From Swiss-Prot:
Residues 833-885 form the SANT domain. Residues 1020-1036 have a biased composition (Polar residues). CDD domains: DEXHc_SMARCA1_SMARCA5 (cd17997), SANT (cd00167), SF2_C_SNF (cd18793). It is found in: Nucleus. A motif (DEAH box) lies at residues 267-270. This is ISWI chromatin-remodeling complex ATPase ISW2. SMART domains: DEXDc, HELICc, SANT.
């Protein structure tokens, strides 16, 4: 039976089971024994689920029968289902034989229908319009379809994966479905929604917006706060929906597994793709009638990870991963011809789609949001500068054995990954290496641009986009790249915002709001790919630049979706920077390969946080490293292009199309074989694996056979492991004696911001030398360069040879004297006084907090850092201001602090001037006079509104947090503006800009006309976006400045 529901009534107002006592509700919410005992009572749900799946496809019977063969009770249940369906099967046969029903058959069918016509399980709900219980708006057509799909899952007792592309409203569809259970099925909980920590508040606000009657509890906070929530709200059943994070699940598992959850909803469900992870195991322990996974990226790169998700949803169906893998293994077909391979491949894909269809809903924006134009993706291929080529060559030569594939089994992959990381840094900017940037003194000028190929192209592109009126998002994996881009923005005078992994939640929101403001002057938004890839809406930008590519291509797709989502009015253009004839070309190729695999397994599949092995084997890594290395060694000069930016983009579009065509032609077998079988030693059409070592690709570049190179390692553990290794010179059998190895002293990476005392540095150096003496460490000449000629070129301070240098260093070890007890005590004391536990991030956060709150606001600075006590902050601050000149590049840190201090001083001055003016008046709202600039005769705000704004600023103070929100609340509650639509409709940002304009007028009035000229002479602009701006106003949805709003619009406003 099918019923069509429009859900136009909501008479219950969220109060169900009015006759249910608190104790009865508590009993309904909590398990009597445990999850295993409760599942034994869910036979009816399981029967309905299996009956539905067996009716869909014979493919499900394969998995169900496997579980039945291992469980007698399960097997009995399947037989019962088969016996119930036997009558239907006979009816089908009767239809096929084209004979009439007998009276007995018809009576039996009618009887069965009558018995179940009022049965809730036989009724199907179909929403035809947005349900009335959704407040503050309506669902779109495709969202209603999604809601109906979720309802059908519930009615068939199935769990599922809502996998719509990001930006299509998965959160709203989920809330609508839980609303359906509450208002239509009268099931008001308990529900649990497990989400990333960063989206906790967003989920709470979405529930409050769309279904305000739902009692939502958020479980977070410290141990005491959580204990209070669990005791007072959860155990007493005073909630409908519990929202919590993955971390809280791990910490409060014992409390949360006591509940009889109606639904477990997991947002960003890729977190449970590994069935052996702690999080996945714990959630599987929870009892629930149904589960819903929400992800923009449902399918991982191998079928086993897909099975992990399906096993979580339906463990009684998908219980054997080996059989799942075997069912779709289509690689063992070497003896078949191409036609047969293609036929089998098509069959495997078809079966997989058939298997997935009941559990998976996937829509993309291009299909459901016709107004959203498709994004245009272009790979921009860029050469390297002379400096980049030099550094790239150095990195390859540093570990040429690994580059040529001569690596051990244990440390081999780690070595290769380290080389890959270093080469990718070089492709981004050589200044990412310490010592590469010219200085001191360190300057911010053109060398930031011309020493990196990517920066040269970026500089050209940004000038073009600025002229066209576009706004730009720039993503990079590396926060230090953002540091360089920040300096660049400052140098080019581009207004920008920034978010990385260290940005606090409050600062993220502030930066996003500032960038998305209607008349924002921010041109660029700098983001790290992972930190800025989720939970952010930046549709005010239409250009996305991926400065480098993430290993996981889905992270890049998430980044693009920050701008390409519903609400975007322009066509989004995505530009991915790729360094030509270098490792980045191979990284991009692997990403395209991964995405093609997704596309073949599930139509337009997306995933996040993929960890499959594509491109991560040793051979793959060697192939990446070797790609383009020959050209680097043969050419000492860079390959930078001086072409026009349009020509560069045109060439990039052509190469992008070639790359896409290359992978679009590959089938499932091709892509999987390419993944596992493609040799990393295939280069330039030749296979070098069949040749001897001397003919290998790497050994053609340089000839290391002339000398034995010492392996360079930066791992302290590996270093001492090699040093302490016993020489195998005795061949006869001897009784092994235990070797007591001396304990290595702790090694400190001394950094300038840690303020190590000179005496402490000396003691630590002596301690290391004494240890080397104890273990009889010997330097070799290879520790001081590859050759005397090269060594002297690199170190032109003296003319000593490598051997002379070695002798001096060895002499230090030989003459080393162990520290005395008194010196050890001194060392420990100086270590306590130093700040060796302060990382570079701690230092950067300290600079930011000092600039924001002030030099002596130790308590606020400590709170901002989060991991330091107030006393330690005070001690560090005093040390910093006494010794800041010891820090390399201290000028930029001081300028950052001083710039914010000037802004704060300006606000204090404005506060004083405003107070002086207002406090001299008996009735400020009536008597306050404002001297407007001469060109402000057509202002939109009335004098009454301006006076009220200034009065509120004086009342709260300019330094008050959320000042403009509080003034907005004052306006809405004031009787003065009860019918003033204009002022009531202003946003807090617009109110803030108007206040900045008024304070500027007050300052000019109180300090005289020469004040502006003095400030201008000092290099301070009155129109700086940092210190105030002229307020643009909005009438009828159009933006205007006060000078260009015509009289007719002003009259309209006054009439309103």
């Amino acid at each position: 039976m099918t019923t069509t529901s429009t859900t136009t009534t909501n008479t219950t107002n969220g109060q169900f089971c009015s006759d249910e006592s608190l104790e009865e509700r508590r009993k309904r919410f909590l398990l009597e024994v445990d999850a295993k005992h409760e599942r034994a009572h869910d036979k009816d749900d399981a029967t309905k689920r299996f009956q539905y799946l067996l009716g869909l496809s014979a493919l499900f019977r394969k998995f169900i029968n496997l579980n039945a063969s291992k469980d007698p009770a399960f097997k009995k249940r399947i037989r019962e289902i088969d016996s119930k369906t036997s009558f239907k099967e006979s009816s089908k046969k009767a239809k096929n034989s084209r004979r009439r029903k007998t009276e007995k058959e018809e009576d039996a069918e009618l009887l069965q229908d009558e018995e179940h016509q009022d049965d809730e399980d036989h009724q199907h709900t179909v929403m035809t319009e947005s349900p009335s219980y959704i407040k503050e708006g309506k669902l779109r057509e495709y969202q209603i379809q999604g809601l109906n799909w979720l309802i059908s899952l519930y009615e068939n007792r199935l769990s599922g994966i809502l996998a719509d592309e990001m930006g299509l409203g998965k959160t709203l569809q989920t809330i609508s479905f839980l609303g359906y259970l509450r208002y239509i099925k009268h099931i008001d909980g308990p529900f649990i929604v497990i989400v990333p920590k960063s989206t906790l508040d967003n989920w709470r606000r979405e529930f409050a917006k769309w279904t305000p009657d739902v009692n939502v509890v958020v479980l977070q906070g410290d141990k005491e706060q959580r204990a209070s929530i669990i005791k007072d709200q959860l155990y007493t059943a005073k909630f409908d929906v519990l929202i919590t994070s993955f971390e809280m699940i791990l910490r409060e598992k014992s409390a949360l597994q006591k509940f009889r959850w109606e639904y477990i909803v997991v947002d960003e469900a890729h977190r449970i793709k590994n069935e052996d992870s702690s999080l996945s195991k714990i959630i599987r322990l929870f009892y629930s009638r149904n589960r819903l996974l929400i992800t923009g990226t449902p399918l991982q790169n191998n079928l086993h990870e897909l099975w992990a998700l399906l096993n979580f949803l339906l463990p009684d169906v998908f219980g054997d991963s080996d059989q799942f893998d075997e069912a779709f293994d289509n690689q063992n077909s070497e003896e078949l011809d191409e036609e047969e391979k293609q036929r089998r491949q098509d069959k495997a894909v078809s079966e997989l789609h058939q298997l997935l269809s009941p559990f998976l809903l996937r829509r993309v924006k291009a299909d459901v949001e016709k107004s959203l134009l498709p994004k245009i993706e272009t790979n921009v291929y860029i050469g390297m500068t002379d400096m980049q080529v030099e550094w790239y060559k150095r990195l390859l030569e540093k570990d040429i054995d690994a580059v040529n594939g001569v690596v051990g089994k244990r440390e081999g992959k780690t070595r290769l990954l380290n080389i890959v990381m270093q080469l990718r840094k070089c492709c981004n900017h050589p200044y990412l290496f310490d010592g590469a940037e010219p200085g001191p003194p360190y300057t911010t000028d053109e060398h930031l641009v011309y020493n990196s190929g990517k920066m040269i192209i970026l500089d050209k592109m940004l000038k073009k986009f600025k002229a066209e009126g576009s706004r730009v998002l720039i993503f990079s994996q590396m926060s230090r790249v953002l540091d360089i881009l920040e300096d660049y923005c400052y140098f080019r005078d581009y207004e920008y915002c920034r978010i990385d992994g260290s940005t606090s939640h409050e600062d993220r929101i502030e930066a996003i709001d500032e960038y998305n403001a209607p008349d924002s002057e921010k041109f660029i938004f700098l983001l790290t790919t992972r930190a800025g890839g989720l939970g952010i809406n930046l549709t005010s930008a239409d250009i996305v630049i991926l400065y480098d590519s993430d290993w996981n291509p889905q992270a890049d797709l998430q980044a693009m979706d920050r701008a390409h989502r519903i609400g975007q009015k322009k066509q989004v253009k995505v530009f991915r920077f790729v360094t030509e004839k270098a490792i980045e070309e191979k990284v991009l190729e692997r990403a395209a390969q991964k995405l093609r695999l997704d596309q073949l397994v599930i139509q337009q599949g997306r995933q996040m946080n993929s960890n499959n092995n594509v491109g991560n084997s040793k051979d793959d890594l060697i192939g990446m490293i070797q790609h383009g290395a020959k050209e680097v060694f043969e050419n000492s000069k860079g390959t930078m292009l001086d072409d026009d930016v349009e020509e560069i983009l045109k060439r990039g579009a052509e190469k992008t199309a070639e790359l896409n065509n290359k992978f679009n032609k590959l089938g499932l077998d091709d892509i999987q074989n390419f993944t596992s079988d493609a040799s990393a030693y295939e280069w330039n059409g030749q296979d070098f694996t069949k040749k001897g070592n001397n003919a290998s690709l790497g050994l053609n570049w340089i000839n290391p056979s002339k000398r034995v190179r010492k392996e360079l390692t930066y791992s302290v553990d590996n270093y001492y492991k090699d040093v302490l290794k016993q020489p195998a010179v005795v061949k006869e059998k001897v009784v092994k004696q235990p070797v007591v190895k001396p304990k290595a002293p702790k090694s400190y990476n001394v950094q300038d911001h840690q303020f190590f005392a000179d005496e402490l540095v000396t003691l630590l150096e002596r301690e290391q030398l004494a240890f080397k003496k104890e273990i009889s460490y010997q330097y070799s000449v290879d520790d001081f360069g590859d050759s005397d000629e090269e060594f002297l070129e690199q170190d032109d301070e003296d003319d000593m040879t490598r051997d002379e240098k070695r002798k001096i260093a060895q002499e230090k070890i030989n003459n080393a004297v162990a520290l005395t007890e008194e010196e050890i005590a001194t060392r420990d004391r100086l270590l306590e006084e130093s700040f060796h536990n302060w990382s570079r991030r701690d230092f950067t956060n300290f600079i930011h907090a000092t600039a924001k709150y002030g030099r002596n606001e130790y308590k606020k600075i400590a709170k901002a850092l989060g991991n330091k006590k107030r006393s330690e902050i005070e001690r560090y601050s005093k040390m910093f201001w006494q010794n800041y000149q010891k820090i390399e590049g201290y000028e930029k840190y001081l300028s950052q602090i001083e710039a914010v201090e000037k802004k704060r001083e300006k606000l204090i001055n404005q506060q004083k001037l405003l107070a002086k003016k207002i406090e001299s008046l008996q009735d400020p709202l009536e008597d306050l006079k404002i001297q407007y600039p001469p060109n402000n005769s057509k202002r939109v705000y009335s004098k009454t509104e301006d006076k009220f704004l200034l009065y509120c600023v004086h009342k709260y103070g300019l330094s008050t947090e959320n000042l403009y929100d509080k003034i907005k609340d004052e306006i809405l509650t004031s009787d003065i503006f009860k019918f003033d639509w204009y002022i009531r409709s202003r946003t807090p940002q617009e109110i803030g800009r108007r206040i900045s304009t008024l304070l500027l007028a007050i300052t000019r009035e109180m300090e005289g006309p020469l004040h502006g000229k003095k400030r201008k002479a000092m290099g301070e602009s009155n129109n700086s976006s940092r210190f105030g701006s002229v307020e643009p106003s909005s009438i009828n949805g159009e933006k205007h400045s006060p000078e260009v709003i015509d009289n007719e619009q002003t009259v309209k406003k006054l009439k309103l």
